[in-house]
């Protein structure tokens, strides 16, 4: 009997520990890191040829790295602030033919930004393996570095010529700047956290602020970020 009681107590303790890992109370806190791949574009409106510009826009492949904290405010509900390094941008590819001359071009824009997201996260336990996580919240970003690479090929009956050009981006509000220095928007995420602490996640970043420098915003000219992010991570 004593052995059965001890065994039963051990099983109850194990079950309680597993449940505690799966749920999160208002007093719990965790720190974690995650990293992964971004697929990003910039959407344009109000420009001459905005529709054609968006049609020729391709996803730019970048990366992300985030340090975050989970702070419980209720059972399976918590706030997740973080500091994130985000590599985003866009690619534009197009071609035109006139008088037997074909001009094709590729423009790749890479932007490095430091972002501060604050997400509200709902955790839905899935038995003893882990929990589904649904998140949403705002972010503010600061563009710190960037570069544009242009590849142009002109093809004539006599042959073709290719030129390459690379320029650093300037961030600010003046007409000679390339992009605004700040960005804000909203994140929407879906992920899964194993009881071991490992996480898998997907996130959609919807840029809401105008990336066109303030002094260049004639008419309704607007450019906004669109970013799909995929990551793996670990929380302690």
Regions inferred by a protein language model and the residue ranges of each:
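Cleavable N-terminal export/targeting peptides
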Residues: 1-27
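Outer-membrane beta-barrel channels and translocator barrels
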Residues: 26, 74, 86, 125-129, ...
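Outer-membrane beta-barrel "beta-signal"
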Residues: 30, 192, 224-236
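Membrane-embedded beta-strand positions in outer-membrane beta-barrel channels/transporters
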Residues: 32, 62-66, 78, 115-119, ...
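Transmembrane beta-strands of outer-membrane beta-barrel pores
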Residues: 37-41, 85-89, 115, 124, ...
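Extracellular/periplasm-exposed beta-strand and loop segments of Gram-negative cell-envelope proteins
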Residues: 41-60, 88-113, 143-183, 209-227
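Transmembrane beta-barrel domains of outer membrane proteins
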Residues: 68-70, 119-123, 191-193, 233-235
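Repeated loop/turn-to-beta-strand initiation elements of outer-membrane beta-barrel proteins
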Residues: 77-79, 197-200
């Amino acid at each position: 009997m004593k052995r059965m009681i001890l065994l039963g107590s051990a099983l109850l303790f194990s079950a309680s520990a597993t449940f505690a890992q799966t749920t999160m109370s208002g007093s719990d806190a965790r720190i974690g890191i995650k990293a992964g791949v971004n697929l990003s574009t910039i959407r344009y409106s109000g420009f001459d040829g905005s529709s054609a510009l968006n049609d020729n826009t391709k996803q730019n492949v970048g990366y992300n790295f985030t340090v975050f904290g989970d702070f419980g405010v209720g059972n399976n509900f918590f706030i997740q602030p973080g500091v994130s390094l985000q590599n985003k941008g866009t690619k534009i590819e197009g071609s035109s033919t006139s008088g037997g001359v074909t001009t094709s071009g590729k423009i790749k824009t890479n932007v490095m930004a430091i972002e501060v997201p604050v997400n509200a996260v709902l955790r839905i336990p899935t038995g003893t393996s882990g929990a589904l996580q649904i998140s949403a919240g705002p972010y503010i970003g600061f563009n710190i570095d960037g570069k544009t690479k242009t590849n142009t090929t002109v093809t004539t009956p006599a042959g073709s010529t290719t030129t390459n050009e690379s320029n650093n981006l300037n961030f600010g509000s003046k007409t000679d700047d390339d992009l605004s220095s700040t960005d804000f928007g909203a994140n929407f995420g879906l992920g899964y956290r194993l009881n071991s602490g490992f996480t898998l996640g997907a996130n959609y970043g919807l840029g809401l602020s105008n990336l066109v420098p303030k002094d260049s915003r004639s008419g309704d000219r607007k450019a906004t970020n669109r970013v799909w992010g995929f990551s793996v991570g670990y929380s302690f």
